[in-house]
Design a protein with these regions (language model features):
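Oxidoreductase cofactor-interface core, primarily capturing Rossmann-like NAD(P)-dependent enzymes
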Residues: 2-32, 36, 44-47, 54-57, ...
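A hydrophobic C-terminal alpha-helical subdomain
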Residues: 215-279
């Protein structure tokens, strides 16, 4: 078992928290890195990078969403002296047709930086996280009773972030996954109308889907406090769903963990019990 801590960037995000919890259960030391951690880390402040890397040789990296943040993550990897093992969180379908957007270009460039490095790398490419509806910006929509989004009639195989965390942890600790790209998804695809129906059943009240055109969606995200670059990144990520480019299932969870990925229905039912959608 490793005696040096595994670095988790960004350690307080949805996947980072779950990787940390799994490492805790296994007795593996780790170091959380974020703007509010003991060793302050900021993607946009390069003076924080060296101290964060001191004394570690293995890292899990969850980069920022927007193109600027992805560029910074690439610079960080290029300067990561002493690092030898890296597991990177990317996005499903990076490099595939129909993804001619800046955010996908940034993800593809970052993957290329990792693959061209001297690191022992693994790239994990999950579908959209189900927990966006309970822990992130989509929770607001559920509480409001309307999913005001721009995915049209396209479908996505939404994945439980706990499955992603389990795969990430396994990849960090098992050298069998060095040099591999692991696409992950839930067990079936769902349109946003179907998602709304699932959430309605789980929450015990009506939640509907309101389809916005992409630019109207950007305008609403800006009103909700997102910066322009991040709002445009979300728009472009949703455009892939809208254009029916994400309607397939990936079996990476079963390949790595030896069990099926958790279904959205089961996730929604259990999540509703926590009260996160109560009004």
């Amino acid at each position: 078992m490793t005696t040096t801590p595994i670095l988790i960037l960004s350690g307080k995000g949805k996947t980072g928290r779950r990787v940390a919890a799994q490492l805790d259960r296994r007795g593996v030391p780790y170091r959380l890195a974020s703007r509010s951690s003991e060793r302050r880390f900021d993607w946009y402040d390069e003076s924080t990078w060296a101290d964060t890397l001191a004394g570690v040789d293995t890292a899990y990296l969850a980069p920022p969403v927007g193109p600027t943040g992805l560029t910074q993550a690439g610079k960080f990897i290029a300067q990561a002296r002493g690092l030898r093992r890296l597991v990177l969180l990317s996005g499903r379908g990076v490099g595939s047709p129909g993804r001619d957007f800046a955010v996908y270009d940034g993800q593809l460039e970052l993957e290329s930086v990792v693959q061209a490095s001297d690191l022992d790398w693994t790239i994990v490419q999950p579908a959209w996280f189900a927990q966006n509806f309970s822990e992130d910006f989509l929770r607001y929509h559920v509480l409001a009773g309307e999913l005001r989004l721009s995915t049209g009639t396209g479908a996505e195989a939404w994945i439980d972030t706990n499955d992603v965390g389990d795969v990430m942890t396994t990849a960090l600790l098992d050298p069998a996954y060095v040099g591999r790209v692991l696409p992950l998804s839930g067990p079936r695809t769902l349109t946003m109308t179907e998602i709304a129906a699932e959430l309605s059943t789980a929450a015990g009240r009506t939640i509907s889907y309101v389809d916005l055109n992409p630019e109207a969606h950007v305008a609403e995200m800006l009103e909700q406090g997102l910066i322009q670059e991040d709002a445009e990144a979300v728009r472009d990520l949703f455009a892939v769903i809208r254009n029916h480019r994400s309607e397939y299932v990936s079996d990476g969870v079963e390949q790595v963990l030896g069990r099926p990925a958790r279904d959205f229905t089961d996730w929604a039912r259990e999540t509703a019990k926590t009260g996160v959608w109560d009004q």
